[in-house]
Amino acid sequence: MNAIFYQIDFGGGVKIFWVLFPLIIGATYFTIYFKLINVRGFFTSINIVRGKYDDVEGRENHKVEVSDTVFTDDGDNPDTIRVEGHEGEVSHFQALTAALSATVGLGNIAGVAIAVSIGGAGATFWMVVAGLLGMASKFVECTLGVKYRDIEADGTVYGGPMYYLTKGLKSKGLAGLGKVLAVLFAIFVIGGSFGGGNMFQVNQAFQLVENITGGNESFLHGYGWAFGLVMAILVGIVIIGGIKSIAKVTDKIVPFMVVIYVSASLFVIFANYHMVGDAFMQIFDGAFSPEGVAGGAIGVLVQGFRRAAFSNEAGVGSASIAHSAVKTKYAASEGMVALLEPFIDTVVVCTMTALVLIITGNVTAENASLNDAQAILLTSGAFESVISWFPYVLTVAVILFAFSTMISWSYYGFQGWAYLFGRTKKMEYTYKILFCMFVVVGAAASLGSVIGFSDAMIFAMMVPNMVGLVILAPKVKDELKKYMKAIKALKV
């Protein structure tokens, strides 16, 4: 854990987590290598989600006869390895919402409050920059997730970094390295799913519910296990059906959550419209000429980049697991859809939180030492100053954020579990039962070092994933050319 969260001391009070360097450098490299795909591909990605290019898929002419008896030495069905035209399990929109549900959550509320308290308003600017760069990383990893996925005879999809590291690096003559990196990633994603994707989420949700109902005097005080049991049952009902069931829930919850939260943020902003100009002045001045911030401009930049990386997980590889289940015959089409995630998560939702905090005067150094639960209450108070009943809405939102994050991360963890232990029903149910048990534990326990460990697991995923992304970037470029050619042919 200490190795993952080792901080490089730059002097002047500035310490930077080393994991930020490969994430940001990688995102910048992909932005340049793919010629600003995060900008020039933005409207194309929206059109894909809207269904404008559905005719490009031509699925009715590309049905695949799948053998359930012939397999490779690795247990893969050769008819479904990188086969173009197979249906997959979910739509572009469902894959997008499933992946978004794992990232849009408590970090957008609590993490942003802490970031702007430490780094000042200027951290918002660098958070947006990092979010825009991260769009390119998401494009690369999610394109690879579809290209190298496995699809079983019954249509069940298995995908993500485990598969593009194994198959992709094998195609480059690096089979041994690919296998090692894939196993490491699988171990890390399982650890992350039980911790940050499960226990942390339900723990923070329960703390907020307990606080809003009276704190130590609440009727729920001491009954975290009961809250966890209810959440575990709800999670279990959804995850038992796999990605199709998860996507059916997330494609309703995620748009609802984002619309409610952004609408409330805009209400606060417009209610204080006379302060909007000053807020943006604080953001731009603070980004380049901060005063009273540890480490000056570098300190502000670090806080913005850190929050973006922790929030949208671009380069971590998790989202490619959800996107690999999409119904498409062009891998790059889903990569294009995926680049919307950091934009929605960081550029839109995180920025809204930051603006509300700045406008309502809640960006102060005294708040820098807050923990996540306290930071949620700080954000809640900022909204409450304009919308008196908003804390109740935020409580519901936090529960939904936590719930949707848990069901998506259960899928991520299961994919790693299946890669290591096999795709049998016995192994599937073993993982899902364990996952639900950890929901109860997370709600009842005081987590402490467990959270540090789970955070380390999530960012450890970045190491094997980024190695694969850089090596396989030319493959992604080929897929992009193929898809853009198909779109141009459709227009003609």
Indicate where each model-derived feature is located:
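N-terminal alpha-helical transmembrane segments of multi-pass membrane transport
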Residues: M1-A102, L106, S117-A123, G134, ...
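Helix-loop-helix module between adjacent transmembrane segments
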Residues: F30-T31, L100, A130-G155, T166-N203, ...
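Transmembrane-helix boundary/entry motifs in multi-pass membrane transporters
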Residues: V49-V64, P78-L96, G131, C142, ...
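Alpha-helical membrane segments and immediately flanking helix-loop junctions
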Residues: K63-A115, L144-K147, A153-G168, L184, ...
